[in-house]
Amino acid sequence: MSLHAVSESNIKQIPDMDYYFISGGLPSNYGGLTKSLLLRSKLFGEECNQNTFFLTFRFDLELSSKIDELYSNGKIDKKFTSVINLFDDFLSVRTNGKRSYEERIGLDQIKKQVGMGKFAKTLLRLFGKKNNEMSVVYYGDGETIRYVDYWNDKNQLIKREEYTKNGNLVLVTHYDVQLNKMYLQEYINDQNQVYLDKLYVWNNEEKDVQLSHIIWYSLEGEIKVKDESELRQYWIEYLQKQNDKPKLFLVDSRPQDKHVFKVKKSPSSYYGAIIHNKHYGSNKYQIKGRYKEVFSQMYNLDAVFFITEEQLEDFKLISGEQETFFFTPHTIDKPLDPAVLNVPSEKYKAVIISRLASMKNLIHAVKAFSLVVKEIPEAKLDIFGSGEDFEKIKKEIEDTKLQNNVFLKGYTDNPDSEFQKAWLTISTSHFEGFGLSNMEALSNGCPVVTYDYDYGARSLVTDGANGYVIEQYNIEKLGQAIISLMKDESTHQKFSEQAFKMAEKYSRPNYIENWAFALNQMIEVRIEREKFSKKVGKKDPSISSYTEDFDKTKIEIDIENFDHNDIKKIRLVGLDRKNKAEIISTNLQNDQLFVIDLEKDVNIEKIAANKTQVIDFYIVFNANGHIKTMRRLSSEETKLSGNSIDTNNGYRVEPYTTVKGNFSWRVTEIKES
């Protein structure tokens, strides 16, 4: 799976679809995931003339101003990309409203009473009424009202009104004065209508309120749901039914998977997930919590897109081979200019441009630099960025007495210039989805000294060619590599030239070509799967004979009714019921017999890593070109022994027939007495 050759004809092959790129919201200080989504939206529009939608779910007071900023800064093109939101563009629009919010007081009237100020100001009497007070809090500009709190004469909060930066009232929260907790939230649209209510009840165990239910006053009448997830699914369903134009719903943010993939897919819709971050826990078989949904929906998805080949291969370790896996690496959000190689670099200067987050592990960069300074006292490290680890990093700088060598510089709006001036950059992350900062460095001819983490380190950095790849968490070797490169001008020159060449592989034309290839394959695979599925037929294969022989289970199936002309291979697979991890895979031994060797064919590591409790069995029929279709294995016409089988690996399996008549195993760990 390599980057594909570019041709003018291929560049124009992005399928004509509506593309929905889905994230929970639009953060104020967004990272690599949102940058990737925005750039994809921009390039699909500008380079391929395709409409894209950046779809967000979360209610956000500042969303409108954030969107304006994206357009004004050229992050997305208004001609092609729309940022749409569940509340702003669906719930508040398709409504008849519960009532008009008549209690509203004009902002100008409020400002006249309280005057202007940056912080909360209190009006002791509201329009002559002696039983109410109010306080006002402004946005950072000190002029625009963010919210207004209303208090009774006992100084108890009774209501809060929240406003956007444009002065629109959008949310009113009502408080129980006895509990000092909210009991009702009313959402207000541009027509001053209450279009949605959230109702809260007291939870004795949690000693706090919890959401009871939501009522949306839709055009079709009141719709009562238990949580926002149902509203999100309702919106996805609505978007699918708007027209028959093909649509790709591509989820970037893993917490959103459950809101999208559980919605029944219309014939014109495609579901996809793009993987931005490490999916495994303590070992490569253990699925991280936020990735469980994408694995459990694996056979419902039309595509899973990967930005590194290494992660694509690691996904296969869990799920087995999938014809829906595609490699679509990142690109650089600028034209590449070889003139960057002529910009003088400061010999003993390193730079890091990163979020100051724990997963970036920047403490190790500071520790390694303390070793560098012992060898090269004039060495400098500039760290640009902000985040929750600022104080920890600052303390490490002070503890290692590097205040004259390592500097926390805050945000930079010109990372290219910083990379061009630096001799090298350092990357010490625990893990990455790709390492966009490293790619930006390479595009400016800046060599990278990086830990060997998953994922992206070796995708971008070839050890000894355009930087150094260091054993992860080996601070001493990291420091030695930095020292070596700072002292060696000849190696630095070579690394710098090769850094730029590596960046060229991630050019815009190659980016579009990889997406064009993947998306057209996605469509072709679904067409071929549907054709092949019809040829195989709807009937589920059934067990005709089931025997257990020490460490082997022999299963004979009745496959006489299947068209063997189009079937090239038949396998028996056992999938973890919860996450669809492929636990067992064995080939047909003759016309009807499968044999499961408990020692060889059962992946105990996957069972242990994910605490597998039930394995469901399927027959997988393969056509040419890895196209496959699956059928659940039936056991309702066969009497199973009912005996449990103990493996030599500490597990007990118990075969049984499900309520639907299908064949499964219960799996339990054998506890030592």
Swiss-Prot record:
Its EC number is 2.4.1.52. Pfam families: Glyco_trans_A_1, Glycos_transf_1. GO terms for biological process: cell wall organization; teichoic acid biosynthetic process. GO terms for molecular function: poly(glycerol-phosphate) alpha-glucosyltransferase activity. One of its GO terms (cellular component) is cytoplasm. Pathway: Cell wall biogenesis; poly(glycerol phosphate) teichoic acid biosynthesis. Coiled coil: none annotated. Disruption phenotype: Not essential. No glucose groups on the glycerol residues of teichoic acid in cell walls. It is found in: Cytoplasm. It comes from the Bacteria. The modification Phosphoserine is found at residue 2. Keywords: Cell wall biogenesis/degradation, Cytoplasm, Glycosyltransferase, Phosphoprotein, Teichoic acid biosynthesis, Transferase. Induction: Positively regulated by WalR. Mainly expressed during exponential growth and rapidly shut off as cells enter the stationary phase. Disulfide bonds: none annotated. It catalyses: 4-O-{[(2R)-1-glycerylphospho](n)-(2R)-1-glycerylphospho}-N-acetyl-beta-D-mannosaminyl-(1->4)-N-acetyl-alpha-D-glucosaminyl undecaprenyl diphosphate + n UDP-alpha-D-glucose = 4-O-{[(2R)-2-alpha-D-glucosyl-1-glycerylphospho](n)-(2R)-1-glycerylphospho}-N-acetyl-beta-D-mannosaminyl-(1->4)-N-acetyl-alpha-D-glucosaminyl undecaprenyl diphosphate + n UDP + n H(+). Belongs to the glycosyltransferase group 1 family. Glycosyltransferase 4 subfamily. This is Poly(glycerol-phosphate) alpha-glucosyltransferase. It comes from Bacillus subtilis (strain 168).
